[in-house]
């Protein structure tokens, strides 16, 4: 005799309907770790997590290395899946071929799609998402939605009409509302680069551009802040703070420090020292010197300069011999009590 569950399942017009306990949409999300532990923490709350299916928005002012972070994630996805491709929607045209190669990305595995307006992006991306199967390995990068006009705005310019465009936010909201179910059902990560603007007021804060629709649809939203990394008077790169504005895994308003240098891109072990100092896993015995702290005896390891703390040899023993991974998880992931304040970590980064 057919059970009521079997009857409902057989009668469903949705071919992916499944008993919840067996549904592939409610299994643990497949995460792709990047090479940078603190980027994984910012994405998932764990050094072992990473890029997951769904929409990740990287927002910030111009020249905040937003595309760098997007390509770091996309490169990790290609490295993990040998048959994966990047669907790259480009409205900025600011990424030369050498930029992709810097992140170890084979440009023959990228479908480059230039876009001029929101509607063009919407029609193409929905057609692509319709055609992709759940087993296809695809990661989508949009660079950027911040600079994308609506079709109406372009038509008004061509017809020499100087009226305000009220359709852009609505078009973007519709675009992401349509994309979101596909990303989950077809297991696709999508990374969208966006701009921010400052709200008006005595204490202005950064607002993600493009209206509220992006907020509702996104799984992760980062707002990137930065300061110069100087050696004497020479700028070597930038110290970034990833401000987690929204996340399914990470506590909102978390602050995660990351360093990016001119010559080496995103520094693999950056941000870890700031957390280790705040949590007592490392210390600063004297100005300009750092040392790991033995958690059972309190003894200090060898004193090293800052550059040596960006090396694998400094971190391997800390990860292997202490509960530093758990400290990071408790500090950043939802459902755990933070052990130190976020501001304390960022103060260490500033110091």
Regions found by a protein language model. Give the residues of each.
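C-terminal regions of RecA-like/P-loop NTPase motor modules
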Residues: 1-22, 32, 229-351
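Hydrophobic "anchor" residues on beta-strands that sit immediately upstream
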Residues: 86, 139, 190
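Short, ordered loop/turn segments at secondary-structure junctions
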Residues: 91-93, 115-117, 145, 195-196, ...
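Catalytic P-loop NTPase motifs of RecA-like helicase/translocase cores
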Residues: 95, 148-149, 199-200
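Phosphate-binding/switch loop-helix module in NTP-utilizing enzymes
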Residues: 115-187
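Phosphate-binding/switch region of NTP-binding enzymes
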Residues: 165-279
């Amino acid at each position: 005799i057919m059970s009521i569950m079997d009857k409902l399942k057989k009668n469903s017009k949705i071919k992916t309907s499944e008993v919840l306990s067996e549904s592939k949409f409610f299994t643990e999300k497949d995460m792709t770790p990047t090479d940078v532990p603190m980027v994984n923490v910012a994405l998932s709350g764990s050094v072992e997590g990473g890029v997951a299916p769904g929409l990740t928005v990287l927002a910030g002012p111009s020249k905040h290395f937003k595309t760098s972070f997007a390509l770091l994630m996309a490169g990790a996805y290609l490295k993990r899946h040998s048959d994966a491709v990047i669907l790259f929607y480009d409205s900025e045209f600011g990424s030369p071929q050498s930029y992709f190669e810097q992140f170890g990305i084979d440009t023959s595995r990228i479908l480059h799609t230039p876009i001029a307006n929101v509607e063009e992006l919407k029609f193409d991306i929905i057609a692509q998402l319709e055609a992709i199967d759940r087993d296809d390995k695809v990661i989508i990068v949009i660079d950027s939605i911040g600079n994308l006009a609506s079709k109406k705005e372009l038509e008004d310019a061509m017809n020499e009409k100087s009226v305000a465009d009220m359709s852009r936010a609505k078009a973007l909201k519709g675009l992401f509302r349509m994309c979101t179910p596909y990303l989950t059902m077809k297991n696709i990560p999508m990374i969208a680069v966006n701009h921010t603007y400052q709200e008006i007021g005595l204490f202005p804060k950064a607002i993600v551009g493009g209206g509220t629709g992006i907020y509702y649809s996104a799984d992760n939203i980062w707002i990137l802040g930065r300061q110069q990394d100087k050696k004497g008077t020479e700028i070597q790169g930038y110290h970034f703070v990833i401000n987690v504005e929204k996340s399914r895994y990470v506590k909102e308003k978390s602050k995660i420090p990351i360093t990016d240098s001119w010559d080496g891109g995103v520094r693999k072990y950056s941000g870890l020292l700031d957390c280790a100092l705040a949590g007592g896993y490392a210390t600063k015995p004297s100005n300009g010197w750092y040392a790991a702290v033995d958690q059972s005896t309190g003894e200090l390891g060898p004193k090293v300069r800052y550059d040596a703390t960006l090396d694998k040899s400094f971190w391997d023993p800390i990860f292997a011999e202490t509960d530093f991974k758990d400290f990071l998880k408790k500090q950043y992931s939802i459902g755990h009590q933070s052990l130190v304040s976020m501001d304390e970590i960022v103060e260490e980064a500033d110091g």
